[in-house]
């Protein structure tokens, strides 16, 4: 694979606090790409509830609170999270041969339930999101969304969150198998090269895929110190300045 130069916004340097005018870089901002977590708290407001329902379906007296689930999100894979919880509660030991079987059963049940539960979940767009996407639409900046979920619930959820006609493309697990390919396909469908796009991510663990696709990115997560908490007051002009600063500064990082 070609080594694509990737840049991301680092926590701790706040562009909106800078009094110096931003430098105009050689790349124009032609597209904004959001992962689904950047639109709403889909993990705690959707996946967490599906896991709790799956635990109950298997007779397990486990119920993840928001705070507990956020801690477990440090583990990248949902099977690791379930296994860690089962061991912590003494349901299975580290060497228990039934651990893998039970983890697989819980995750399979959760996957079936999430398709039905997600649209009924009480999910709201992050503050300022709709205003930013509307501004992008009116100024001619393309908007795309990528998700590891199924199209049957991702597409209607996006419409539920931001309305019809404002998002030009939605890439889901039905289209590609890896997060990096999701970003690449979204850019291809938007007609924008990676260097002319800005990605908004809703979780630190999604950083690597955006980096691998050669994208500059912003972390929007109220639960991560140093990250932007939401989109309140953010407009396309601000995104253009940030995009130029990211590329002109040469910031490169594998951590948010």
Locations of the language-model features?
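Active-site neighborhood of HAD-like aspartate-dependent phosphohydrolases
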Residues: 2-70
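Asp-based, Mg2+/Mn2+-dependent phosphohydrolase catalytic module
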Residues: 1-24, 151, 156-256
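A metal-dependent, Asp-based hydrolase signature
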Residues: 72-118, 127
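A short, structured active-site edge motif that brings together acidic residues
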Residues: 66-71, 97-102, 164-177
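Substrate-recognition element of Asp-dependent hydrolases with the DxDx(T/V) motif
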Residues: 51, 129-159
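An amphipathic alpha-helix signature
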Residues: 48-52, 56, 78-87, 111, ...
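Conserved SAM-binding loop
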Residues: 40, 143, 199-200
């Amino acid at each position: 694979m070609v080594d694509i130069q990737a840049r991301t916004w680092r926590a701790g340097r706040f562009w909106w606090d800078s009094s110096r005018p931003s430098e105009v870089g050689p790349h124009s901002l032609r597209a904004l790409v959001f992962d689904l977590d950047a639109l709403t708290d889909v993990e705690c407001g959707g996946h967490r509830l599906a896991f709790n329902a799956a635990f109950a379906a298997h007779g397990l007296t486990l119920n993840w609170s928001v705070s507990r689930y956020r801690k477990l999100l440090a583990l990248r894979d949902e099977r690791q999270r379930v296994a860690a919880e089962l061991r912590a509660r003494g349901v299975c030991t580290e060497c228990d041969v039934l651990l893998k079987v039970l983890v697989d059963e819980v995750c399979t049940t959760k996957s079936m339930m999430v398709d039905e539960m997600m649209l009924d979940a009480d999910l709201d767009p992050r503050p300022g999101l709709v205003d930013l996407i509307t501004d992008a639409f009116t100024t001619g900046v393309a908007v795309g969304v990528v998700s590891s979920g199924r199209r049957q619930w991702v597409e209607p959820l996006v419409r539920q969150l931001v309305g019809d006609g404002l998002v030009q493309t939605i890439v889901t697990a039905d289209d590609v198998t890896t997060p990096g390919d999701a970003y690449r396909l979204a850019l291809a469908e938007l007609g924008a090269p990676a260097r002319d796009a800005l990605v908004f991510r809703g979780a630190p663990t999604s950083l690597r895929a955006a980096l691998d696709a050669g994208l500059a990115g912003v972390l929007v997560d109220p639960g991560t110190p140093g990250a932007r908490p939401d989109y309140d007051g953010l407009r396309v002009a601000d995104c253009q300045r940030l995009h130029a600063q990211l590329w002109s500064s040469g910031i490169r990082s594998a951590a948010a």
